[in-house]
Amino acid sequence: MATLGIKAGENVLMVWAQPSKPATLKDYAEELSSIVGTDGKVSVENVDRLLLSSHSASTFDCAVSCVLADSSAVHSLDTLAELARVLKPGGKLILEEVVTGAEAQRERTSEKLVSTLKLSGFTSVTEISKAELSPDALSAIRTATGYQGNALFRIRMSASKPDFEVGSSSQIKLSFGNKAPRPADKPAPDPNTVKMWMLSANDMNDDDLDLVDSDSLLDEEDLKKPDPSSLKASTCGEAAGKKKKACKNCTCGLAEELEQESKEKEKTNLPKSACGSCYLGDAFRCASCPYLGMPAFKPGEKILLDNKTLTDA
């Protein structure tokens, strides 16, 4: 009992599991009550009923779970989370559990138990003791769980709840008094080094400076304006037995040439009037005008005549 670290005046939660004997459970609860005294309190809960209890959050200073020699239970994540909830910030948890040297269907290794405690929110997880099970305890666990191996140990672990509640916040004070020292100023560049990479305007008039005139590199043929026809590719728009067609993104002028030819062809196909007044309406049209009876239209506008109209004309 002295190894549990329970002090007078503390509120202690004692969790037990089957197959603990009622007499053993009563003696242990009375022993805890004598330690905490009248200023403290000991609450007893079954591990399977812990999640159904109505304990308020941050109630107990210490929780002792399944430490009786004749009790055995596997602490689930929900059970450990509930123990963390009812403990006060900084509260202590002491638990015992049967572990195995290899992964089993129900029992787990000590490393797995440590990981489960940390996932439940506990810190400072420490192994206090580890002992082999007695033949009677081993037989009872085999009967209850169906475990067939011999590598079973009873391990006692201690863990602590952090000094803060889940979801709590705290203001962080930032001090701007001690600022980081400013870096030393960069040295000024050497003027001689800068001159090596610059061409002074005064150097342009030096007789010793020999610059090449780019125009002198061109001959008379290079300066002549090229003939547009010479810029056209030899095979551009040429296809035996096919209509002349410009290339996509044409740059030789064939596309513009074909467009101009198309516009001129449309102009020649426009209907011609002998009097030149057909577009004004029936009042200005001749008796044999093919546009007779049609509304006025703009000069040059394309008008389609049906076969009946042409026959009547």
Swiss-Prot record:
Q: Which UniProt keywords apply?
A: 2Fe-2S, 4Fe-4S, Apoptosis, Cytoplasm, Iron, Iron-sulfur, Metal-binding, Mitochondrion, Nucleus
Briefly, what is this protein's role?
A: Component of the cytosolic iron-sulfur (Fe-S) protein assembly (CIA) machinery required for the maturation of extramitochondrial Fe-S proteins. Part of an electron transfer chain functioning in an early step of cytosolic Fe-S biogenesis, facilitating the de novo assembly of a [4Fe-4S] cluster on the scaffold complex NUBP1-NUBP2. Electrons are transferred to CIAPIN1 from NADPH via the FAD- and FMN-containing protein NDOR1.
Q: What is this protein called?
A: Anamorsin
Q: What is its main location?
A: cytoplasm
Q: Write out the ranges of the annotated region (N-terminal SAM-like domain).
A: 6-172
Q: Where is this motif: Cx2C motif 1?
A: 275-278
So what family is this one in? Belongs to the anamorsin family.
Task: Kindly list the positions annotated as binding [2Fe-2S] cluster.
Answer: 236, 247, 250, 252
Fe-S binding site A as annotated region, ranges: 236-252
User: Which residues does [4Fe-4S] cluster bind?
Assistant: 275, 278, 286, 289
Write out the ranges of the annotated region (Linker): 173-223
* Origin: domain of life: Eukaryota
